């Protein structure tokens, strides 16, 4: 384990399985990992900062060396205020790397003693982003496997009309009084035969 404090900054709107993967792996590397939610007044988040804190607390409750915090302003200044030695950043694709490299170089210019560590999420989460999760959820699509269950439930609560619409569409294809679609009924009939 590396001695010292690392910060993992982001919006986490909402937290995804990719975020949770990096948090878990980062917690094994650093003595303390601070998951730092950026308070960005220029964005219109789906979840309030308080809701994101609550979700992240729930998701990291078993990780003793993980702390949830918020900040605004420069990431470098926030890191210095905690005596952090490292910024942890997730990289999913080349486009992420180009952006993150520019940020890391700027951060190094502002604070030469602060290192940036790039970490790739597990392959199964390499395409998952909060933005894509929001888009799928807002369209009433399934987000199971993209986000932890607690986040899926919060999305469902937040976007209830979209989920009701999806459920209503599914009901259109079910036989009255059975709750089973004609296709599923046919598969069951073939299995019995």
Language model features with spans:
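Nucleotidyltransferase catalytic core that binds NTPs
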Residues: 1-193
């Amino acid at each position: 384990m590396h001695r010292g404090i690392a910060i993992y900054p982001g919006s986490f709107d909402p937290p995804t399985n990719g975020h949770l993967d990096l948090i878990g792996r980062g917690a094994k590397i650093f003595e303390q990992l601070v998951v730092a939610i950026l308070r960005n007044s220029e964005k219109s988040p789906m979840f309030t900062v308080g809701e994101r804190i609550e979700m992240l607390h729930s998701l990291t409750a078993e990780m003793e060396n993980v702390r949830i915090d918020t900040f605004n302003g420069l990431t470098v200044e926030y890191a210095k205020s905690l005596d952090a030695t490292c910024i942890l950043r997730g990289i999913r694709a080349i486009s992420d790397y180009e952006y993150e490299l520019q940020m890391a170089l700027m951060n190094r210019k502002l604070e030469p003693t602060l290192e940036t560590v790039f970490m790739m999420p597990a392959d199964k989460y390499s395409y998952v982003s909060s933005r894509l999760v929001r888009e799928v959820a807002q369209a009433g699509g399934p987000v199971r496997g993209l986000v932890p269950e607690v986040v899926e439930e919060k999305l469902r609560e937040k976007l209830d009309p979209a989920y009701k619409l999806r459920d209503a569409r599914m009901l259109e294809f079910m036989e009255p009084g059975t709750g089973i679609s004609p296709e599923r009924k046919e598969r069951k009939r073939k299995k019995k035969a």
